[in-house]
Design a protein with these regions (language model features):
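A short, conserved alpha-helix in the catalytic core of glycosyltransferases
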Residues: 172-173, 177-180, 184-189, 195-204
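Cell-envelope/extracellular polymer assembly enzymes that use nucleotide-activated donors
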Residues: 2-4, 32
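Short aromatic/hydrophobic "clamp" motif used to bind/position activated sugar donors
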Residues: 87
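Short, flexible, basic/aromatic active-site loop/helix in glycosyltransferases
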Residues: 122, 134-170
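Short, well-formed alpha-helical segments that are part of the catalytic scaffolds
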Residues: 12-25
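Glycine-rich, basic loop-to-helix element that forms the pyrophosphate-binding segment
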Residues: 65-82, 99
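Conserved donor NDP-sugar-binding/catalytic core segment of glycosyltransferases
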Residues: 99-140
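A conserved acidic beta->alpha catalytic loop
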Residues: 22, 29, 37-48, 68, ...
Length: 204
């Protein structure tokens, strides 16, 4: 199974740098990474070009003119350009656990999509990570976590327990952490580009 990691970004190069660095440490690499850029300035382009020099997999920068919030359109363009059979989608202000791609591939099943969650970090911890540019682990006891601590646990038995506990509350996709088959995405014509928000809910 060939995978494409799609990263959505808009004018947050400092966060994107940390995100791309976290891709380097994956236990299983995606076959390619596409940065879908909704109109960022040249600072983002320069950053991506610097990463291309020694990035472990092909790194592709797709850019569209800044005409307001057009994330759905950019994501559709990114999936259209992808060569992977399986798409993993995140936001550019996410930095990944080192088994992130491995987990998505392991759990992929025909006819299903995956919706993950995230650990929300406070402003101080976020700034520290962006400034240090050091890939680090986040634990349930890490100071600066703003949402449920269990989202920082990487353990299959524990994850299964909380998946059963919260599954009835999951009603839609989450663009910062979801994956799906490219063929399924194309079959439903992708995201609704007329929506300014909630396009993931309409798709799933």
């Amino acid at each position: 199974m060939k995978t494409t990691l799609i990263i959505s970004t808009y004018n947050r190069p400092e966060a994107l740098s940390v995100c791309l660095d976290s891709v380097r440490f994956q236990t299983v690499m995606p076959n390619e990474v596409i940065v879908g850029d909704d109109g960022s300035t040249s600072e983002t382009k320069d950053l991506i070009e610097s990463f291309k020099k020694d990035f472990p997999v092909p790194l592709i920068h797709l850019w569209q003119e800044d005409k307001g919030f057009r994330l759905a359109m950019m994501r559709n363009k990114s999936v259209a350009a992808a060569t992977g059979d399986y798409i993993i989608e995140i936001d550019g202000d996410i930095f990944l656990h080192n088994k992130f791609v491995e987990d998505h591939k392991r759990l992929a099943k025909p006819g299903h999509y995956l919706r993950g969650t995230r650990v929300n970090l406070g402003q101080k911890l976020t700034e520290e990570i962006c400034k240090s540019k050091v890939n680090r682990r986040i634990y349930p006891w890490t100071i600066g976590i703003q949402n449920r601590a269990e989202t920082a646990i990487h353990s299959t038995p524990v994850s299964n327990f909380f998946a059963d506990r919260y599954k009835k509350n999951v009603s839609s996709g989450l663009g910062c952490n979801m994956s799906f088959w490219r063929s399924d995405f194309l079959a439903i014509n992708g995201y609704d580009e007329f929506l300014k928000a909630g396009e993931k809910k309409m798709m799933t």
